[in-house]
Amino acid sequence: MKILFINLPFSGHIIPTLGLVQELVKRNMKVTYLLTSDWKEKISYTGAEFSEYQDNKKLSVQMKNAYYAAVKLVSDYDLVIYEQFFFLGKHVAEKFNKPAVRIFTSLASNELIMQEFINADGMFGIFRSKWICRQWTKEVAKGIDLKTDCWLKEILYNPPELNLVYTVRNFQPFADDFAEENYKFLGASIYQRALNKSFIMPPKKCPLIYISLGTIVNNTISFYRKCIRAFEHENVQVIMSIGSVVNKDRLGKIPDNFSVYSFVPQLEMLENTDVFITHGGMNSITESLYYGVPMIVIPFITDQPLNAKRIEELQLGKKLMFRKITSEMIRATTLSVMKNPAIHEQVLEMKKEMRSKNANVFGANVIAEYMSKYC
């Protein structure tokens, strides 16, 4: 079987899919992953073939570049797999009468969930205006026969037959809206990744707090300083990942119980972590739950506020609002979560569910079963 995989160049939308690609390649399927050039090394590591479309700072141009590159390739493939926000993926497949599978690296979307994404800060905010959404869609999808007049509606109202979601059904809000025969919930995407030989895990001496705000919103020096003040006199060990933008020297004196890095291999960290302070991206949440780690979620954009809300609803941790946060709030909330038996009990239950399926093996099985109708 030959599979064309199409995605947009955003880390959180790509990283979970690479485990599925590895599994498909392991089964002797030929996978070509269509992405921008800066992802070539990571794609090649999976064993898939890499195919490039031109990157651009404008999302609209990225979409068009990906679409036209895919159209040139797709006739040679048996199946198209695409991530939900590349909304033209189904149209690429239909143009050449190919089956399509859609992947959700965030929560599966219905009207209420999509509205939450739009109302949050981030790149979707501009689409609160229905006129802007229609005009943007018209420009991106010129000459393509859409089912709706807005790309976000296209995600909602023009789904493919099969959808794979990287969380568990019990974490998904409005789960009953997503029919079991069409939406398969995989759990967390945990797979073999390239080793980072430059990182040496410090010996664990006491309860460990891991702090990371992901790859997009990490230029927040004031927040990192508040974390230092929160825990500098506590009997805890803190590992803080600050990204490549912030200069460590600007944080001032680093206490002895802190280790600060520009990058930390997250899965290795979570295996040893007692509480995770996170921005609440879907990957970070599913990975944390896979390792049974409760969270303090400080949401910023798009799906993160809804993810944080869900963490509190399910008693898997606590939410703090970035604009109101103080050192005392960080300290008190983190220590409270660390000692809360009800939260730990719920996290362990969710850990069992996240591990109940090997997400990428299950996903590959579902794809193989689906494609048996076409082969």
Which residues does each PLM region occupy?
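Glycosyltransferase specificity loop/lid
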Residues: 1-129, 137-138, 222, 232-375
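Short, solvent-exposed amphipathic alpha-helical segments in soluble enzyme
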Residues: 20-22, 97, 179-182, 201, ...
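A general structural signal for short secondary-structure junctions and capping/turn motifs
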Residues: 42, 71-73, 90-92, 153-157, ...
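A nucleotide-sugar donor-handling region in carbohydrate enzymes
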Residues: 128-208, 213-216, 242-245
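Conserved hydrophobic/aromatic pocket- or pore-lining residues that grip, position, or stack substrates
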Residues: 164, 209-210, 227, 238, ...
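A conserved mid-protein helix/loop that constitutes part of the nucleotide-sugar donor-binding site
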Residues: 216-229
